[in-house]
Amino acid sequence: MSEKADTLACLTRETRMLTRIEQSLAHHFAHLEGPHTPPRLLAAMRHAVFPGGARIRPQLCLAVAGACGDNDPVLAEAAAVAIELLHCASLVHDDMPCFDDADARRGQPAVHKVFGEPLALLAGDGLIVMAFEVVARGGQMNPQRLGALIGAVGRG
């Protein structure tokens, strides 16, 4: 294969991976919608996650899973999404006035600037909870791997 073909194949793989990650994130957010989810909290959580950055962490997770045989793509995707949600939560908390007091993140106002500090704190916490819910749901078909995965995701 030529260098140009290799580059094109790599870009195609990366595009497919990013699409998979974005679709999975959107799916899990749609799962949250309903009468039991406060709309402003959900909006703040969405604001923290979309639009995303490079999504390097979930891409690395999926790439490692692929290199290891990816025998459970649902679980690998759940882990990738959870890692991104935890990363976004850390950014929300890091942007707060008590830490970096950032005005913007990813080209838009920081969550605390749009929704206020109390809701931003809850949004970051909500993303952490959501991350572990995603992993738990993704591991339903492979529960023997769930404990180790939850531990690995939790350790970062």
Model-derived features with residue positions:
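Mg2+-dependent prenyl diphosphate-binding active-site environment of isoprenoid biosynthetic enzymes
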Residues: H36-G156
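N-terminal amphipathic/basic leader segments beginning at the initiator methionine
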Residues: S2-E33
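Intrinsic-disorder/low-complexity, polar/charged segments
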Residues: M1-S2, P143
